[in-house]
Structures are given as structure tokens and as C-alpha cells.
Swiss-Prot record:
Disulfide bonds join 44-69, 48-71, 53-72, 60-75, 83-96, 90-117, 119-137, 126-162. Serine protease with a variety of targets, including extracellular matrix proteins such as fibronectin. HTRA1-generated fibronectin fragments further induce synovial cells to up-regulate MMP1 and MMP3 production. May also degrade proteoglycans, such as aggrecan, decorin and fibromodulin. Through cleavage of proteoglycans, may release soluble FGF-glycosaminoglycan complexes that promote the range and intensity of FGF signals in the extracellular space. Regulates the availability of insulin-like growth factors (IGFs) by cleaving IGF-binding proteins. GO terms for biological process: positive regulation of apoptotic process; programmed cell death; proteolysis. Residues 105-164 form the Kazal-like domain. Residues 40-120 form the IGFBP N-terminal domain. It comes from Bos taurus. This is Serine protease HTRA1. Its EC number is 3.4.21.-. It is found in: Cell membrane; Secreted; Cytoplasm, Cytosol. The keyword Ribonucleoprotein does not apply.
Length: 487
């Protein structure tokens, strides 16, 4: 009896052959490369040869798409037509959906179950032919019909119906456009102020300057900067809707640079409320709105750089007020306009620009104090005294401020103190006398000028100002006659 045979085992695979098999396996598992038909499509050629494709008809209602093999261009089925393995693919922008709204899967296609071509987009669109289409696919179909008739193609102008805005609460611009929300809220209460002056030997008036302000009472009280309205004879206010009114000056605080004017308006006006500037924090977003260069309702944004920039730091020796510093752009004409927080509350009055990115606003807490005191004065019937002005905006010059300006402007005068002229308002005594921007007033009537307050004090007392100003590296003698006006 023979012993049982051992089971047959194939000879061991040589190491070299095993290595070749391992290297070949991933290559065979890779998807078909470009030029190869989709491996899952039944009846597709091994390689796609576009030269062997039959040319599609000249006009395709559903547009031209690739066939199931991804090789040849064919006419896609239009919206609402049947689709599937037997019927062919859907047209451009359409998807094949079986009953109950389920997209046709590979399993459904293998079972040869038909579906319907449905547009992947279901929102209306407005076309360049001023027509509203139910969806993008219908617009594309209309565009193809136009091209067949040798007409211009129809393109998409906007989402949504023609003539209507697109409100998508889930869009990023709808969620995060908080600045626009603030502007929309405050703009109706911001006014444009224009200042007029009579020409000599003529009754004709001409506009000579402009500024901004904001309404604080429904009956027409408006807050602005004192320097905006105390230097001209007639003040005109223009509302956002274009209506214009003559304004009367009710009260002025020159030291704080705040003024209160009033217009007579029938009906109630929109107003802005004052916020608490004491609660303001560095880094908060702020919005400045006004009429720079007479461009009404111009909006700039920025952050609060500091909430307490002391007047003495700005060279205002006798100032007891802390200013709000912001990098929001404030230009000529923005003066008097509101600086608001994201709640739409006024936290300051735009008042001063030193240079790009460094601007200052009077805090709203100071405005509240002014309005309260003004109410008391008017309730007691105290008369407002006449005001003198020469028509300049100035700031006190300190050694640190002079160094900063010297670094920015090489031709800045070589001085360490005085009153630095930021702006000379047209058609004023200052302009008539020859003062210019960037001049530094160093003496008046033989008395040295150390700060802007020295100039203000002399203007109140003297009827003639014999000034010495430093312009570049020259000292120039200038005579200015202050003008007295009724507030």
C-alpha cells in the first residue's frame, strides 16, 4: 500500500516575477485616462476618437452635451423631456430626475428606468431682453432660439425677476453688510449746510463754503460745528430729499466748536439720538457721514483709534475736552457731520483732520452738555452776544506736533510754537488779509502767540490784527480786520 500523496502545490513564484505583478496591479486599477471612454458605460469604445463621432444637428433645443461615454457631442434633451439609458442625456444645466424627485443613479440607469429632465436651478432670472425667466435653463433655451434666428444671444443680467431687487437672507452681503444698515438708518437725518455771502456793491449772493450737520429734534434743531456757521451771513440747509430751508443760528459755543441751528419745517423730521461716548472703546467700528467737497451723504468708515485724545495733546492749551481720534477719513465739508457707532447712535461730531488717517471728533457727551446748557440759556431769555471771526481753522503748535508735521512736509516752517492754520475759508477777512493754509501765526499786535487760544482771545478784544506769520522760512507782516456778525 502506497503512502498518500501530498497535495499539489504550485512552484513558488520567483521574487522578480512577484515584484512585477505588484507594480502592474495599481496601474490596472487606475481610472481611464483622457482619451479613454468611461469604463462603466456599456458599449463605449476602448478609446475615444472624436473624428469618428457623427456631427450633431445644427440646432439643439436642449443644447449640446457629451454622450454617455463622454466622447461625442450630442443634442441634449430639453427641459421636461424623458431621459435615461434609452433616451439619452439631458441638455445643458438639466439633470435627469426619476419620479419622486430622485436624481437618476447608476443603478436606475442599469435598470433602464426613464426620468425627466429638470433644471438644476429653480430660481427666476432676468435676461438682457428685459424678460423674466422661470429658471436659467429657460433663458438658455431662449438664447439658443435667438441665435438660430441670427439675433443677439440672451444673457443673464441678475438673479430674480426683472425690475426687482434680489433679497437673499442667506447671502453673505445680506448677513454682513452692517455698515450699509447703519447708513440706511442715519442718512435721512444728516443735512448738507451751504453758506452764502453777498457780493460787494451787489445784492447777489454766492455760495462760499459748505459743511454738514444732523437733526436732533423733530421740529428742526440741527447740531453742527461752530466754525461751519459763525463765519457767514446766510445759512441754507438741504435735507436728504432735496428740500432746502433757511436756517437761524440758535446758539454757539466757540470754545467747544459746537453750534445749534434751526429750520422751520412742516411735519416731523427724522432725528439721530446721542450715544454715550464715555462707553466707547478703542477698536470699535465707526461710520462718518457728511458732505465733503459738497458731495452730499458721503460715507467713510474706520475704527476708534483712541477715545481720550486730550486737547492739550493737540496743542489746545486751555481745552478741557478729550477728543475721539479715528482713522475714518474726514475731509473739508465733513465738518459738523455725525460720527456714529454700529447702533446708529451719534458718538461724536466730525471736526478736525490733521492728516490722512488721523481725524478727531467732539464726543457726544460734550454735545449733550451743550444742548442742556443751551436749553437753559434760551429758557431764561439770555441774549446771544455778537461774534467776531476772521475765517480760519487752526490748532496750537507744540514741539512734538511741529516735529510730526516737519517729518510729513519738508517745507514746514522751522518753529516750535504758535497757531498753525489748517484752513483759510474763502471770502473771509483772513483770506482778504493774505493768510494761507500752513502759515504759523507767531505774534499779533506785538504779543507773542503760543497757542490757538491766544489768537481767539485777541480776536474778541481787538478790531485790527497786525500779525507776523511764518511762511516757509520767511516772516511776513499781515493785517486782518475781524468781522462782527449776528449769530
Amino acid at each position: 500500500m502506497q503512502p498518500p500523496r501530498a497535495p499539489f502545490l504550485p512552484p513558488p513564484t520567483p521574487p522578480l516575477l512577484l515584484l512585477l505583478l505588484l507594480l502592474a496591479a495599481p496601474a490596472s486599477a487606475q481610472p481611464a485616462r483622457a482619451g479613454r471612454s468611461a469604463p462603466g458605460a456599456a458599449g463605449c469604445p476602448e478609446r475615444c476618437d472624436p473624428a469618428r463621432c457623427a456631427p450633431p444637428p445644427g440646432s439643439c433645443e436642449g443644447g449640446r452635451v457629451r454622450d454617455a461615454c463622454g466622447c461625442c457631442e450630442v443634442c441634449g434633451a430639453p427641459e421636461g423631456a424623458e431621459c435615461g439609458l434609452q433616451e439619452g442625456p439631458c441638455g445643458e444645466g438639466l439633470q435627469c430626475v426619476v419620479p419622486f424627485g430622485v436624481p437618476a443613479s447608476a443603478t436606475v440607469r442599469r435598470r433602464a428606468q426613464s426620468g425627466l429632465c429638470v433644471c438644476a436651478s429653480n430660481e427666476p432670472v432676468c435676461g438682457s431682453d428685459a424678460k423674466t425667466y422661470t429658471n436659467l435653463c429657460q433663458l438658455r433655451a431662449a438664447s439658443r432660439r435667438s441665435e438660430r434666428l441670427h439675433q443677439p444671444p440672451v444673457i443673464v443680467l441678475q438673479r430674480g425677476a426683472c425690475g426687482q431687487g434680489q433679497e437673499d437672507p442667506n447671502s453673505l452681503r445680506h448677513k454682513y453688510n452692517f455698515i450699509a444698515d447703519v447708513v440706511e438708518k442715519i442718512a435721512p437725518a444728516v443735512v448738507h449746510i451751504e453758506l452764502f455771502r453777498k457780493l460787494p456793491f451787489s445784492k447777489r449772493e454766492v455760495p462760499v463754503a459748505s459743511g454738514s450737520g444732523f437733526i436732533v429734534s423733530e421740529d428742526g434743531l440741527i447740531v453742527t460745528n461752530a466754525h461751519v456757521v459763525t463765519n457767514k451771513h446766510r445759512v441754507k440747509v438741504e435735507l436728504k430729499n432735496g428740500a432746502t430751508y433757511e436756517a437761524k443760528i440758535k446758539d454757539v459755543d466757540e470754545k467747544a466748536d459746537i453750534a445749534l441751528i434751526k429750520i422751520d419745517h412742516q411735519g416731523k423730521l427724522p432725528v439721530l439720538l446721542l450715544g454715550r461716548s464715555s462707553e466707547l472703546r478703542p477698536g470699535e467700528f465707526v461710520v462718518a457721514i457728511g458732505s465733503p467737497f459738497s458731495l452730499q451723504n458721503t460715507v467713510t468708515t474706520g475704527i476708534v483709534s483712541t477715545t481720550q485724545r486730550g486737547g492739550k495733546e493737540l496743542g489746545l492749551r486751555n481745552s478741557d475736552m478729550d477728543y475721539i481720534q479715528t482713522d475714518a477719513i474726514i475731509n473739508y465739508g465733513n465738518s459738523g457731520g455725525p460720527l456714529v457707532n454700529l447702533d446708529g447712535e451719534v458718538i461724536g461730531i466730525n471736526t478736525l483732520k490733521v492728516t490722512a488717517g488721523i481725524s478727531f471728533a467732539i464726543p457726544s457727551d460734550k454735545i449733550k452738555k451743550f444742548l442742556t446748557e443751551s436749553h437753559d440759556r434760551q429758557a431764561k431769555g439770555k441774549a446771544i452776544t455778537k461774534k467776531k471771526y476772521i475765517g480760519i481753522r487752526m490748532m496750537s503748535l507744540t514741539p512734538s506736533k511741529a516735529k510730526e508735521l516737519k517729518d510729513r512736509h519738508r517745507d514746514f516752517p522751522d518753529v516750535l510754537s504758535g497757531a498753525y492754520i489748517i484752513e483759510v475759508i474763502p471770502d473771509t477777512p483772513a483770506e482778504a488779509g493774505g493768510l494761507k493754509e500752513n502759515d504759523v501765526i507767531i505774534s499779533i499786535n506785538g504779543q507773542s502767540v503760543v497757542s490757538a487760544n491766544d489768537v481767539s482771545d485777541v480776536i474778541k478784544k481787538e478790531s485790527t490784527l497786525n500779525m507776523v506769520v511764518r511762511r516757509g522760512n520767511e516772516d511776513i507782516m499781515i493785517t486782518v480786520i475781524p468781522e462782527e456778525i449776528d449769530p
